[in-house]
From Swiss-Prot:
This is Inorganic pyrophosphatase, mitochondrial. InterPro entries: Pyrophosphatase (IPR008162), Pyrophosphatase_sf (IPR036649). One of its GO terms (molecular function) is inorganic diphosphate phosphatase activity. Present with 195 molecules/cell in log phase SD medium. Mg(2+) 2 binds at D157. SUPFAM superfamilies: Inorganic pyrophosphatase. It comes from Saccharomyces cerevisiae (strain ATCC 204508 / S288c). Involved in energy production. Its activity is stimulated by uncouplers of ATP synthesis.
Amino acid sequence: MNLLRMNALTSKARSIERLKQTLNILSIRNHRQFSTIQQGSKYTLGFKKYLTLLNGEVGSFFHDVPLDLNEHEKTVNMIVEVPRWTTGKFEISKELRFNPIVQDTKNGKLRFVNNIFPYHGYIHNYGAIPQTWEDPTIEHKLGKCDVALKGDNDPLDCCEIGSDVLEMGSIKKVKVLGSLALIDDGELDWKVIVIDVNDPLSSKIDDLEKIEEYFPGILDTTREWFRKYKVPAGKPLNSFAFHEQYQNSNKTIQTIKKCHNSWKNLISGSLQEKYDNLPNTERAGNGVTLEDSVKPPSQIPPEVQKWYYV
């Protein structure tokens, strides 16, 4: 009886492992369905990086890359917008057709993140979770002591903490580890903490406690960076919901699911009369193509290299 039971358990374990391998292969194949093309020179107003499909058609990073949520493995897709240690504030455009990655601007000038001593640029690979949306048309209930907040009208942000510096526009399968509810200019702006599934430490980390074991201090450092990073631009310190505590991976998965449902409402067109500044929802399917016109990157202004002591 014990031998039969052991054989059954072994067989089940092998089946689970085969399923994991199959899902991983399918995920890799899905990622190979996409590529990118670039127009203009990086660090200029004309720079755009577009998603393209296998047939050369232009798609949307925001809407055409699948969320690909696996609740058992706690994995999703991530679009890399800003590689670690770089300063350009690149993001998926909400206004332009097909939502290319562009550099954010303010008053017609390109935006760069300030260097908060002792760091240079963004302290993590920074990006977005596709097919999610933080809904600005409704107030979201948070902790018992928190005021309900509206979403920031963007896809969910994520911070990848692995060892590699990732490439802008790349699509990565990442493991969800937790999240931090940033309050930015009175809006809810979740920061989801993830790690690339191909990182050597990914198999050892599945929640906040393991992050502290393998990356001691990184959660506190991340919170302090997000608290202070706008101060050099004359903004006040940012604050956080839930008494500044990170939410665990299970709660974060629920947040991702809610934001995926919000995204479904967005692309349905049912919210057009509720909000004036909704993101562009044009997706692949009409055969639109563009020429790749890569140009060498322009020089970063020297003042961007300045360190700020906050």
